[in-house]
Swiss-Prot record:
Keywords: Cell projection, Cilium, Coiled coil, Cytoplasm, Cytoskeleton, Developmental protein, Differentiation, Flagellum, Microtubule, Spermatogenesis. The gene is odf2. The lineage of its organism: Eukaryota, Metazoa, Chordata, Craniata, Vertebrata. Self-associates. Associates with microtubules and forms a fibrillar structure partially linked to the microtubule network. GO terms for biological process: cell differentiation; regulation of cilium assembly; spermatogenesis. This is Outer dense fiber protein 2. It comes from the Eukaryota. One of its GO terms (cellular component) is cytoplasm.
Length: 649
C-alpha cells in the first residue's frame, strides 16, 4: 500500500442538488521549494502530494441497532476522502452546485494567474525600460545639438584658419618689407660711412678750394701788380718817349710775367670751376640723400605703425586661438561624453535586445500555456458534464439503496429478537449492497481509468469497502448513539459545506475576475507585442542613427585631431615668428636708436656745411666777379699790348 505511486487528480461529477463534502489530506512535510513549484507549473495538471497513510477511525455500530436513516456513503483513499450525505429536505436550498465545485486545478490556475500577474509586473517594469529608451532618445537629440555645435565650431575654425592665413600673408609681406628696410638701412649705413668720407673729402676740397682761391687771389694780385707795373712802364715810356734796351727788356720780361700769371690764373680758374661743379654736384647729392633720409624715416614710422597694428592683430589672433582651443577642449569633452553615451546606448541596446528576446520567448510560452489552458478548460467542462451525469445516476441508485436500507433497519429494529434471520437478511442485503457497491466501484474504476489511471486505487477502495461492510455488522448496535453524533457531525459538516460553498462562490468570482484579467492581460500582451514590434523598428532605426552618429563622431574626431595638430603647428609657427619678430624688432630698434643718435648730429653738421657752402658760394660769386673783372682787364691789357706791339713795330 505504501509503495504505490501517488494517486492522480480526482474528477467528480455531482448533481447540483446533492451536497458534497471533500476532505483532502495534506502531508505533514514542509511546503515544497521553489524548484518543486516550478516543476508543478511546468506540468500544468500535476499530481497531488501524497499525505501520510493514516486511516481515520469510523465509529463502531453494533449489529441490529443501526438505523440507516440519514446515513451517507463514505469513501477514503490514500490521499482523498469522500463523504456523500443524502439531501436534506430542510437544507435543500443550501446544497452545493456545479459552479461551487473547487478542485486543485483551480489552485493551479490561481498560481498560474499569480505568475501571469508577476509577468505583467515584469512587463510594466519593461515599460519603464521603454521610458528609459525615450530618455535615451532625448540624449540622442542632445547629441545632435552637440554635433551642430561642433559643425558651427568647425566653421569658426575654418574662418579663423582663413584669418590666420591672411595674417600669415601679412606677416610674410611685413617680413619682406623688413628685409627691404634692413637692406635700405644697410645702404644708409654704407652711405653714412660714405657721407663721413664725403665730409672728410668736402673738408679737404674746402681746404683745397680755399687754397685755390688764395692762389687765385695771389695770382690776381700779382697779375694786378704786373698790370700796374706795365701801366706804369707804359706811362713812363709815354712821358719819356724813348725806349732803351733795358726798357725793352723790362717790357718783354713784364710781358712774359704777365702771360705766366695769366696762364696760372686761367689754370686756377679752371680748377675752381671744376671744384665748384663738383661741389654743386655734391650738394645736389646731399639734398637727394636728405630727401631719401626723410623718405626712409617716413617708411620707418609707417613700418612701426604697421608693426604695432600687426602686433595688435597677432594679439587678437592669439586670443581667438585661445578661445578656439578652449572650444576644442569643450568639444573634446563633448565628444568624450558622446562616446560614453554611445557606449551606454550600445549596452542598453544589448540589454533591451536581450529583454526583447526573453519577452518574446515568454510571450510565446504564455500564448502556448493559454492555449493549453483553454483546451484543458474545454476538456474539463466536458468531463464535468459527464461526471455530473454519472453523479445523478449514482444519486438515484444511492437514494434507492438508502430507502431499502431504511426499510431493512426498521425491520431489524422491530425484529431484534430474531437477530439471526435478520443477520442473514442483512448479509444478503449486504451482499446485494456489495454487488451494487462493486458495480459502483466498477463505474468509479472506469471513471478513474479515464482520468489519469485510477485503477490502482480501485482495488484499495474495494478492500476498504469490504472492511467497511464488515465494520457495519459490528456498528449496528451503536447506531443510536452514532446517529446523534452523526447529526452533530452532519451539522458541522453542513456548516463546513456552507463555508466551502461561500469559499467556492468567492473562488468562482475570483475565477471570473481572473478570466476578465486574462482578457485584459491578453489585450495588454497584444498591445505589448505591437509595442515590441514598434520598439524593434525604432531600435533598428536607432541602430542606423547610432552607426551614422558613430561615423560622424569618428570624422569629427579626426577633423578635430587634424585641427588641433594644425593649431599646434600654427602656435609653434606663431611663437617662432613672434620670437623672430621680437629679435628683429629689438635689433631694428637698436640700429635705429644708434642711427638716430648718429643722425641727431647731422642737422648741425648740415647746417654748418650749408653755411660754409653759402659762404663759399658768396666767395665764388665774388671771385667770379673778380675773375670777370680781371678777364676784362686782361682782355683790355691784351688789346693794349697788341696795339702797343703794332705801334712798336
Amino acid at each position: 500500500m505504501k509503495n504505490r505511486s501517488p494517486s492522480p487528480p480526482l474528477h467528480v461529477h455531482v448533481d447540483e442538488s446533492t451536497p458534497v463534502h471533500v476532505h483532502i489530506k495534506k502531508s505533514s512535510r514542509p511546503p515544497a521549494k521553489t524548484q518543486q513549484g516550478a516543476k508543478l507549473k511546468k506540468k500544468g495538471m500535476g499530481n497531488l502530494r501524497r499525505s501520510a497513510t493514516v486511516k481515520t477511525k469510523v465509529p463502531w455500530i453494533p449489529p441490529g441497532k443501526s438505523s440507516l436513516r440519514d446515513a451517507g456513503l463514505k469513501w477514503e483513499g490514500l490521499t482523498h476522502r469522500l463523504d456523500i450525505t443524502p439531501p436534506d429536505t430542510e437544507r435543500m436550498f443550501s446544497a452545493l452546485r456545479m459552479s461551487d465545485l473547487s478542485t486543485d486545478e483551480e489552485e493551479m490556475k490561481r498560481s498560474k494567474m499569480n505568475s501571469y500577474e508577476e509577468k505583467i509586473a515584469t512587463l510594466m517594469s519593461e515599460m519603464g525600460t521603454l521610458k528609459h529608451e525615450l530618455e535615451l532618445q532625448k540624449r540622442e537629440k542632445y547629441l545632435g545639438k552637440c554635433e551642430e555645435q561642433l559643425a558651427a565650431s568647425k566653421r569658426l575654425l575654418e574662418a579663423q584658419q582663413e584669418e590666420l592665413a591672411e595674417v600669415s600673408q601679412e606677416l610674410v609681406e611685413t617680413e619682406n618689407e623688413n628685409v627691404w628696410l634692413k637692406r635700405s638701412l644697410d645702404r644708409i649705413q654704407e652711405e653714412k660711412g660714405l657721407s663721413i668720407l664725403q665730409k672728410q673729402q668736402l673738408q679737404e676740397e674746402k681746404a683745397h678750394l680755399l687754397a685755390k682761391l688764395l692762389e687765385a687771389e695771389t695770382d690776381g694780385a700779382e697779375a694786378a701788380k704786373q698790370v700796374t707795373l706795365l701801366s706804369d712802364t707804359i706811362q713812363r715810356l709815354k712821358h719819356e718817349k724813348r725806349m732803351t734796351s733795358t726798357d725793352i727788356n723790362l717790357l718783354t720780361r713784364q710781358k712774359e710775367l704777365l702771360l705766366q700769371k695769366l696762364n696760372t690764373f686761367e689754370d686756377t680758374n679752371r680748377s675752381l670751376r671744376t671744384l665748384l661743379r663738383e661741389q654743386h654736384r655734391q650738394e645736389t647729392e646731399t639734398y637727394r640723400l636728405m630727401e631719401q633720409k626723410e623718405m626712409l624715416l617716413k617708411k620707418l614710422s609707417d613700418a612701426d605703425t604697421e608693426k604695432m597694428h600687426l602686433q595688435l592683430k597677432l594679439h587678437e589672433q592669439e586670443e581667438k586661438v585661445e578661445d578656439l582651443l578652449a572650444q576644442l577642449k569643450t568639444e573634446k569633452d563633448l565628444s568624450k561624453t558622446a562616446s560614453e553615451v554611445s557606449k551606454s546606448i550600445e549596452s542598453t541596446k544589448a540589454h533591451l535586445q536581450g529583454q526583447l528576446r526573453t519577452r518574446e520567448a515568454e510571450n510565446n510560452r504564455l500564448s502556448v500555456q493559454i492555449r493549453n489552458l483553454e483546451r484543458n478548460e474545454a476538456h474539463q467542462k466536458e468531463e464535468i458534464v459527464k461526471l455530473m451525469e454519472q453523479l445523478t445516476e449514482l444519486k438515484q441508485k444511492v437514494d434507492s439503496e438508502k430507502e431499502a436500507l431504511k426499510k431493512s433497519v426498521r425491520a431489524q429494529k422491530q425484529r431484534a429478537e430474531r437477530s439471526e434471520e435478520t443477520l442473514e437478511m442483512l448479509n444478503r442485503q449486504l451482499v446485494g449492497n456489495d454487488s451494487e457497491l462493486a458495480k459502483a466501484l466498477s463505474s468509479a474504476e472506469t471513471w478513474r481509468s479515464r482520468y489519469n489511471k485510477l485503477m490502482k486505487e480501485s482495488s484499495q477502495h474495494e478492500e476498504e469497502v469490504a472492511v467497511l461492510s464488515n465494520r457495519l455488522k459490528g456498528l449496528l448496535g451503536e447506531s443510536h448513539g452514532i446517529e446523534e453524533r452523526g447529526r452533530l457531525e452532519r451539522d458541522s459538516l453542513l456548516e463546513k459545506l456552507h463555508q466551502q460553498t461561500t469559499e467556492n462562490t468567492c473562488l468562482r468570482l475570483e475565477h471570473e475576475k481572473l478570466k476578465a484579467s486574462l482578457t485584459t492581460v491578453e489585450e495588454k500582451l497584444s498591445l505589448a507585442q505591437s509595442e515590441v514590434q514598434q520598439l524593434k523598428n525604432s531600435l533598428r532605426q536607432y541602430e542606423g542613427l547610432v552607426d551614422t552618429y558613430k561615423e560622424q563622431l569618428q570624422k569629427s574626431r579626426q577633423e578635430a585631431n587634424s585641427i588641433s595638430l594644425q593649431l599646434e603647428m600654427s602656435e609653434k609657427e606663431n611663437k617662432n615668428i613672434k620670437e623672430d619678430m621680437n629679435l628683429e624688432l629689438e635689433q631694428m630698434r637698436r640700429k635705429f636708436q644708434n642711427r638716430l643718435s648718429e643722425l641727431e648730429h647731422l642737422p648741425e653738421i648740415l647746417k654748418s656745411t650749408e653755411l660754409d657752402l653759402q659762404e663759399c658760394h658768396q666767395q665764388l660769386r665774388s671771385y667770379e666777379q673778380k675773375s670777370s673783372e680781371l678777364s676784362s682787364t686782361i682782355s683790355d691789357l691784351r688789346t693794349r699790348v697788341r696795339n702797343w706791339r703794332n705801334c712798336a713795330l
